[in-house]
Amino acid sequence: MSNRSVCREASHAGSWYSASGSQLSAQLDGWLSQAQTSKRPARAIIAPHAGYTYCGSCAAHAYKQVDPSVTRRVFILGPSHHVALSRCALSTVDIYRTPLYDLHVDQKVYGELWKTGMFERMSLQTDEDEHSIEMHLPYTAKAMESHKDDLTIVPVLVGALSESKEQEFGKVFSKYLADPTNLFVISSDFCHWGQRFRYTYYDESQGEIYRSIENLDKMGMSIIEQLDPVQFSNYLKKYHNTICGRHPIGVLLNAATELQKNGVNMSFSFLNYAQSSQCRSWQDSSVSYAAGALVVH
């Protein structure tokens, strides 16, 4: 490897998760040991991207479905929190650092994606500011530990895509989703509820506020399980649920739909749901987390 490799530092280590490799490794092992293997080998997972103290245990339910003996390449699709982006962006770096070990960007696949003319590049600053991809790197490194020398990653920052763009990017990624050696990690939290998020939808028939939030999230989750991008868009238009990874999810649903058209049989199931706290009053706030996996039959 030439010493000209560009590295992205683990900029959220020490704040959003432990910067100590041994401590982080033990934490991840602990969370994974609590989760069941039920949807292996996963071809895609949806998992949250909050600080690990909030969502580490939830995310484990998705990462437990990853089979390192099958997977060779991990696509990580995360939403853009800090920059306005109407397309998807690729990184400019060769290596993503984690406290566990360095992850290498798959430059061959990056070249193929770049050739489509549909992608832009994100700056190193944007890359290091963004947490939606980074929060999946330690878990990816842990899940793939036994085959780390064969592993490459394909980080993709997903912008505020229109429905037609979600469809176009779904088509582009569908050929990669068809390959059993690829895993797609879709980075998303679910409802951000409370005045600080400017979202306070409440269905009183559900009882306590946190129950209304759960009901709203599970409505969206069941649509995702049906792999129906149109219904998912309609749900978001109707309820405006603050699912921050709605566009990465939309891309996955469109990619899956594309494969189903070609006779590929697959199923998606959510395996865990959690809330950062239980909202009972208008002063409260919470973020919801869900973990699920897509299996191709």
UniProtKB/Swiss-Prot annotation:
A Pfam cross-reference name: Memo
Database matches in InterPro entries: MEMO1_fam (IPR002737)
Domain of life, per lineage: Eukaryota
Function recorded in the entry: May control cell migration by relaying extracellular chemotactic signals to the microtubule cytoskeleton. Mediator of ERBB2 signaling.
Family as reported in the entry's similarity comment: Belongs to the MEMO1 family.
Quaternary state and interactors: Interacts with ERBB2.
NCBIfam families: AmmeMemoSam_B (TIGR04336)
Protein name per its UniProtKB record: Protein MEMO1
Origin species: Xenopus laevis (African clawed frog)
